[in-house]
């Protein structure tokens, strides 16, 4: 399986316009927290960077099975936290994709690991992960915290073939 587009958009042009809404984060265990986001701009623009055009009409599955209003999530990872390797669910005919924006990065760690490969990202970088088909995790955070904004969508498998070689 191979991605046919750049995985990371360095210093994404809309990064400084994205903010996590005020409010309380929910505990997700082991120093990981999340907060639903009820409204956000630049959802379409985030996926367009990767030649994807998701439809909001397909967001019902994500709404019921995940944490986000329209499935936008603010994630806050504390010192020592990491994301364990996993693959997320998706309906049979779709791929669950996430365009993640690094809002704050610790001095050490916090990089995504996708398909066993560490991906170097910096603050304001946007990266793509096909979370229902690519095993993914992150490196442990040391000396700070990691804050990301995660845009979620379902993309039909036939549309994913334009950017990813499916087996």
Where are these regions (language model features)?
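Intrinsic-disorder/low-complexity, polar/charged segments enriched in Ser/Thr/Lys/Arg/Asp/Glu/Gln
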Residues: 3-4, 96-98, 148
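Surface-exposed beta-strand edges and flanking loops
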Residues: 5-7, 22, 54, 75-79, ...
């Amino acid at each position: 399986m191979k991605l046919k587009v750049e995985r990371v958009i360095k210093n994404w042009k809309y990064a400084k316009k994205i903010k996590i809404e005020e409010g309380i984060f929910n505990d997700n265990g082991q120093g990981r927290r999340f907060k639903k986001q009820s409204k956000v701009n630049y959802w379409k623009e985030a996926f367009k960077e990767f030649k994807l055009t998701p439809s909001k009409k397909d967001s019902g599955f994500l709404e019921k099975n995940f944490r986000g209003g329209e499935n936008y999530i603010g994630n806050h990872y504390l010192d020592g936290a990491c994301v364990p390797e996993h693959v997320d669910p998706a309906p049979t005919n779709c791929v669950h994709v996430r365009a993640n924006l690094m809002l704050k990065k610790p001095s050490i760690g916090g990089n995504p690991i996708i398909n066993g490969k560490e991906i170097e990202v910096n603050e304001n970088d946007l990266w793509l992960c096909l979370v229902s088909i690519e095993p993914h995790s992150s490196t442990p955070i040391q000396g700070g915290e990691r804050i990301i904004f995660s845009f979620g969508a379902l993309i039909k498998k036939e549309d994913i073939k334009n950017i990813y070689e499916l087996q």
